[in-house]
Amino acid sequence: MRWTAIAVTAPTQEAANEVCSTLPSALQESTVLLAVPDATSLKVGSGAATLNALLTVAEELSARAGFSTLSAEPLRDARVLVLHSGASARGGSPNPCLPQALTSLPTVGTVPGETEAVSMAEWAVRTASRLFDDMPPGLVVCSTDSLLLIPSTVALQPDVLREVAGAVVAVPQSLEVAVEHGVCAPAAAGSDLLGSIVYRGSREQLATLASPDGTYPVRQGAVVARGW
């Protein structure tokens, strides 16, 4: 995947810069890497952070394309990745003073000659790059707070986004995990179209959402949207 731009969001400029510093080995030279702090000191959600990141990306790409004002033209063929990083690590982290995005994983880079450990943020970039390798121009939003482990043979099929505007990534989980997270509910029985996401639903609410093998499609921190 050749990303046009990658925007890293964080509560502060310093935190965003630190996460960006772990990413160069996962990028192509042509990728524009942007550190985007939250627009306010108040706590903001991922939706507001995404909008702020998209504005920053649009401004940067417009300027690089020679526009003196904000223009959507540079986005038409752009593939943009937004990475959300939180303020601090979750409980149990081996690095409690660091954002979760900077947590080192027990693995090394896959680039020949590379020996440095991979951070959660870099893992998110590499996973998104492989998973959405054939996507058309559009937007991918990923969290760096969870470790998404997907078989190397799994990837988004190009024809999927020709039929729908976007898609979410969900993985099968047990009921014990599902009741603590968001479970994808289909628009209709047997449909692959997303109707809603049931967040921290009761066992009774989730009873009808179980797959034939008894697992539940739990939403992970990755969303893809086609076109601009």
Task: Report each predicted region and the residues it spans.
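Unchanged
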Residues: 1-228
